[in-house]
A protein has these predicted regions:
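N-terminal low-structure segments adjacent to metalloprotease catalytic domains
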Residues: 1-78, 82, 273-275
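Post-HExxH zinc-binding segment in Zn-dependent metallohydrolases
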Residues: 1-42, 160-229
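Charge-rich, solvent-exposed alpha-helical interaction surfaces
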Residues: 30, 34, 38, 62, ...
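Pan-zinc metallopeptidase signature
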Residues: 43, 197-275
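Auxiliary, metal-adjacent structural segments of Zn-dependent hydrolase domains
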Residues: 70-131, 186-193
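Short, solvent-exposed loop/turn segments at secondary-structure junctions
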Residues: 120-124, 140, 161, 182-185
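Short pre-active-site segment immediately N-terminal to the catalytic Zn-binding motif
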Residues: 133-148, 163-166
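Active-site alpha-helix of zinc metalloproteases
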Residues: 141-150, 154, 173, 177
Length: 275
């Protein structure tokens, strides 16, 4: 994982994301009034910048040069450099736990990522293309680890295949179990299994027994995990699926979609889902 401040990426986002200060708004308005054609052409640069930032050369650099020479840009750049170091410190401090998220929970090869760091005032996490994310979000002083959750949610969501609207809720719920619940629990040292999207809480409770099996938790350990996470179910009414621990996250999502009639049930009838 590389955290990078790139002038072209930074300027592009200052130009085309919401203005977070009056000074930036006025500068953008002046550029638009004076160099409208060049401004429009600059919009097309986004993907080119993210795909090859080191070798990117704009077709027309008028807009970029004006901002680079602006007296306030150096100050903005220093703020972003400082923010980048703050994010990197958080990432490096929790690197081992994050690596285990991918090796032990996701179990699927994920490409290397470059995180293009921009002004935190822009309030964005934008998955631009495979291997590239634009990050500009305030680090919550009360919950600084949340930014790691958001980065990894963005990466994983965009590296798991797409599903139809009805089945996509399983994808969202299971990725939340992986990141917002299990990964967050490891980061914080206490259970975070009651966190996440309110609309998915019910589905995640149905998935929870199978999630424990996917995690390789033995049936004898279920009770201690239920106590830890404050989620209960009747252990004896679930057939233990040994094959789940051999799957990756995408395969587990497929399994849950395929067997949803057994997983979501009003009465916990012991049945054997198809693997």
């Amino acid at each position: 994982m590389k955290f990078l401040v790139n002038d072209y990426a930074l300027i592009w986002n200052l130009l085309f994301q919401a203005s977070f200060s009056e000074g930036i708004y006025k500068l953008k308005q002046k550029l638009w009034d004076t160099y409208r054609n060049e401004y429009n052409e600059t919009f097309k640069d986004k993907d080119l910048i993210m795909q090859d930032p080191k070798n990117f050369i704009p077709n027309n650099d008028i807009i970029y040069n004006i901002i680079l020479e602006n007296k306030n840009y150096e100050k903005l750049r220093k703020q972003v450099d400082k923010y980048r170091l703050e994010v990197m410190r958080l990432w490096d401090k929790n690197k081992k736990i994050t690596e285990e998220l991918y090796s032990k929970i996701i179990r699927k090869e994920i490409p290397d990522y470059t995180i293009f760091v921009v002004n935190k005032e822009l309030n964005i996490i934008d998955h631009v293309c495979q291997g590239s994310i634009v990050l500009g979000k305030e680090i919550d002083k009360k919950a600084p680890l949340n930014i790691l959750l958001e980065i990894n949610m963005s990466i994983i969501i965009n590296n798991i295949k797409k599903y139809n609207i009805e089945d996509n809720k399983f994808k969202k719920a299971i990725i939340e179990l992986a990141v917002l619940n299990e990964y967050a629990t490891s980061l914080c040292g206490k259970s975070c299994y009651l966190s996440g999207t309110p609309d998915l809480i019910g589905l995640k409770r149905w998935l929870y027994p199978y999630w424990l099996m996917y995690m390789g938790i033995s049936k004898e350990q279920f009770l201690s995990y239920m106590m830890r996470d404050q989620i209960s179910f009747d252990v004896e009414k679930y057939a233990y699926e040994k094959e789940l621990r051999k799957m990756n996250l995408e395969e587990f999502i497929d399994f849950c979609i395929r067997n949803q009639k057994y997983i979501i049930r009003d009465k916990n009838i012991k049945k054997n889902p198809e693997t």
